[in-house]
Amino acid sequence: MDEMEVFKYQGKRFLCSGEQLPSGSFQAVVRCKLPPDDLVRTLILGAGHYMNGRQALARAKELAEEWVRTHPEDEHL
């Protein structure tokens, strides 16, 4: 089963999830709303495969934190 959570980090909001793949493993995914249209966009599709949605969700949160550190100029999230 997929796991999903709105994750706030340093004033930014992400939709983090652990999504089940056809193989049965799970992938970490990070999305957010981006201007100008506020459509939800995928920022990161994690490369790893996890045994369950909870593990993939935890990794998605880590990836969101890394994204904030590597994109300090993106204040509009």
Predicted regions span which residues?
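Acidic, low-complexity intrinsically disordered segments
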Residues: 40-77
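N-terminal segment of the canonical double-stranded RNA-binding domain
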Residues: 1-29, 33-35
